[in-house]
Amino acid sequence: DGNEISGEIYFVLSGPTEWESQWHKSLKPGKSFITVPAAVSVVNEGFEKAVVEMTKYRRKIRRPNKDNEKLAVIFNDYMNCLFGDSTTEKLLPLIDAAADAGCEYFCIDCGWYTDTNWWAGVGEWKPSAQRYPGGIEKPIKYIREKGMIPGLWLEIETVGFDCPNIDKIPKSWFFRRHGKIVSDQCRYQLDFRNPEVQDYATSVIDRMVNEYGVGYIKMDYNINSGIGTEVDSD
């Protein structure tokens, strides 16, 4: 939250609070709760220097990860390219170009699972036969033949209004508030506390890896489910 008052500016990053982060914890008498660690940067050189010091701190506490040491070169077919309208015919020349450019990963973005509206059609996560005659395995296999790791886009936490099996999904799978299923932008938010939802997510990942041959998954998150669910809440 950034605000300017009387020629001065202050910048606040909040943690687990109800006002800024839609989070709260009710404590019974005698009970306590330890919040997440907080960091404060104090400098004399101004805002930019303060941000520099905070960035140094974040880099220092970041867990060791080889992917952070050598970032891979990834080609994604969405932005300034196919925008969720991929087909085998459109992908093959892009795969060639990405390989020639030295890319290590090639990711097929949204839309691979529907013939129509990629946004509201999320949830079942099965390839469109119309977009990929002979199966999505064909372009995925070609990506590997060109020396790259194939990837698919996924938003596992959402189910769209136009999902083919939306009427078969139990209401208990979703966030609910005021007795109604929470929705945002033609999508519903799954509740991953539910073991059935966990099993569903696992089955989707297993299918993408073991059946389609995917070696990379781009996890996206595009909706705002608000303050969460009232089901079994504190």
Set out the residue ranges of the language-model regions.
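Catalytic domains of carbohydrate-active enzymes, especially glycoside hydrolases
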Residues: 90-113, 211-212
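N-terminal accessory beta-strand-rich subdomains and adjacent acidic, glycine-rich linkers
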Residues: 1-63
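Acidic/aromatic-lined carbohydrate-recognition and catalytic surfaces
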Residues: 113-167
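Active-site and adjacent substrate-binding regions of carbohydrate-active enzymes
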Residues: 110, 128, 141-143, 196-234
